[in-house]
UniProtKB/Swiss-Prot annotation:
Protein name: Iron-sulfur cluster assembly protein CyaY
Higher taxonomy: Bacteria, Pseudomonadati, Pseudomonadota, Betaproteobacteria, Burkholderiales
Family matches, as HAMAP family: CyaY
GO biological process: iron-sulfur cluster assembly
Record function comment: Involved in iron-sulfur (Fe-S) cluster assembly. May act as a regulator of Fe-S biogenesis.
Organism from which the protein derives: Cupriavidus metallidurans (strain ATCC 43123 / DSM 2839 / NBRC 102507 / CH34)
Amino acid sequence: MPPLSESEFLALASKALDQLEAAIEAAADAADADVEINRTGNVMELEFEDGSKIIVNSQAPMQELWVAAKAGGFHFRNDGSKWVDTRGGGELYAALSGYMSQQAGVTLTLK
């Protein structure tokens, strides 16, 4: 996918974070898991019952979404249809489902 202008990327990232927030709420409700979601602009903080956190934020200069979790730090770039890990090639929702499940202690599946 060719580079986007900063405003195009910010719109794409904002939409992705909106969709991700809704998917996380649905997954937490379905699993009866306690996941607190706090969002300020381009930063989403997920806090779990044990006090651990996952941070998801957009990085306009790199045109990436960054995820910081207990499992490590990960960068995702949009390929035109989905957000893909720049190192491992995994898809954002699948990867984040795993990170969240690890930290929540229950299976959480983002759809």
